[in-house]
Curated annotation (Swiss-Prot):
Family annotation (InterPro entries): Ribosomal_bL34, Ribosomal_bL34_CS
Protein name as catalogued: Large ribosomal subunit protein bL34
One GO cellular component, as annotated: ribonucleoprotein complex
Keywords from the named record: Ribonucleoprotein, Ribosomal protein
Organism: Latilactobacillus sakei subsp. sakei (strain 23K) (Lactobacillus sakei subsp. sakei)
The keyword Cytoplasm is annotated on this UniProt entry: no
PROSITE patterns in alphabetical order: RIBOSOMAL_L34
Keyword Signal: no
């Protein structure tokens, strides 16, 4: 058996785990967004 690729991308999973709403739900998530805004990131979350 060969080893399979461990990254099997799924859009729904990506957005549920790393999305904007998930970030806004927790205090630390909001800190992440604030840091990324301060840095001037074009994209804040997945």
């Amino acid at each position: 058996m060969t080893t399979k690729r461990t990254f099997q991308p799924k859009k729904r999973h990506k957005e549920r785990v790393h999305g904007f709403m998930k970030r806004m739900n927790t205090k630390n998530g909001r800190k992440v967004l604030a840091r990324r805004r301060a840095k001037g990131r074009k994209v804040l979350s997945a």
